Amino acid sequence: MTMADRIVVMDASVAVARLRAEEHTPQILGAFREWSRAGTRLIVPRSFWWEVVNALAVGWGYSGDQVLESVHELEVLGIESRDADRGQLLLTISAVERFRITAYDAQYLILAETLVAPMATLDRSLARAAGARALYLGPGDPGHRLSEPPAVYEHDVTWPNYKGASAYLAKLRAEAARPA
């Protein structure tokens, strides 16, 4: 992979921290500078933008003009949005159950796994679920010593037990095989 091909999946927590003056903002800004220097493509699931708006407007009380300015600030960074397909939806269901994370967080994990890319986050639970793929940018560590790989505590996956799973998967495979 060349420098121009380098990608990072970034979750909304990193973007919101970049926009706000928080204690770990210098580390976040440093990561963005490095990504810019390296020509790294920042890729997010389409829902990223709604998460950013929600965090700023509801979580931090930003006015509409402040939210729009913030979204524009992120937009000029060239962040690329991706839609999830049905296969990624199934992987998301599995990740939610295995790692006990939200479906929104699982989208970032599945996108990073699909793209074989690192995933930048400030979310400790998401970083633990991502394991070696995580670029944890928050304070401290995500719950493990940096000298050893994180322990990923997975739970049993039950969705394959659904009696209609085989038929549904066959339908998805047939849809995927059809020319676009």
Question: Which residues does each predicted region cover?
Answer:
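Short, well-structured N-terminal submotif of metal-dependent ribonuclease cores
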Residues: 1-44, 59-67, 168
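Acidic, PIN/NYN-like endoribonuclease modules and their adjacent C-terminal/linker elements
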Residues: 2-7, 82, 109-153, 157
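Short beta-strand scaffold positions
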Residues: 10, 43-44, 83, 103-106, ...
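Alpha-helix capping/helix-boundary segments
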Residues: 14-15, 48, 88, 108, ...
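Acidic catalytic patch
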Residues: 46, 68-98
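Short linear interaction segments
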Residues: 149-180
